[in-house]
């Protein structure tokens, strides 16, 4: 299949990488797994045995007329422990590499179908200046965009750092969430080749 390149000749690309069917279930699974992996999972609360104090029985077992109590740190008391206390845990979800790559291929194919993938021959800025990048994006009519290059471009990264709706990634740093989060995805021809190499 062919991909149109902005201001240049169309390029031949792999049907497997850019022309497959959209698998919504798989993409959803990849997005959930990616976002779950980013969770810190360090929250912690104290159970009745962990709250300080409460060693002595508040009053004797029988004869007071009050409900029996063994500790002032019971979950039903003010200042007591939490009944089912949250503990630190990993939220990581297992996703095979094969499934992850298939999800990325599915997203790329859908971006092509929805005309959200903009391919350019090359994209760079001379200096790490936001103004220069904004002017360059304006000529392409792009506002909310993810820029994907084949390698890390420091000037481009620094120029985009202060723009709320612009992000810069290299191919290996692209993930399911960032690829679907923006209105448009701007990729260079060399990045397209790198995607084919990694996902082909």
UniProtKB/Swiss-Prot annotation:
Disulfide bond positions: none
Record-linked Gene3D superfamilies: 3.40.1370.10
Region of interest (Disordered), residue spans: 38-67
GO process terms (BP): translation
Entry GO MF terms: rRNA binding; structural constituent of ribosome
Gene Ontology cellular component annotations, sorted alphabetically: ribonucleoprotein complex; ribosome
SUPFAM superfamilies cross-referenced by the UniProt entry: Ribosomal protein L4 (SSF52166)
Function statement: One of the primary rRNA binding proteins, this protein initially binds near the 5'-end of the 23S rRNA. It is important during the early stages of 50S assembly. It makes multiple contacts with different domains of the 23S rRNA in the assembled 50S subunit and ribosome.
Quaternary structure (record): Part of the 50S ribosomal subunit.
Keyword flag rRNA-binding: yes
Family per record: Belongs to the universal ribosomal protein uL4 family.
InterPro entries: Ribosomal_uL4, Ribosomal_uL4-like, Ribosomal_uL4_dom_sf
The keyword Cytoplasm belongs to this UniProt entry's keyword annotation: no
Designated gene of the protein: rplD
Protein name (Swiss-Prot/TrEMBL): Large ribosomal subunit protein uL4
Alphabetically ordered keywords of this record: Ribonucleoprotein, Ribosomal protein, RNA-binding, rRNA-binding
Coiled-coil annotated spans: none
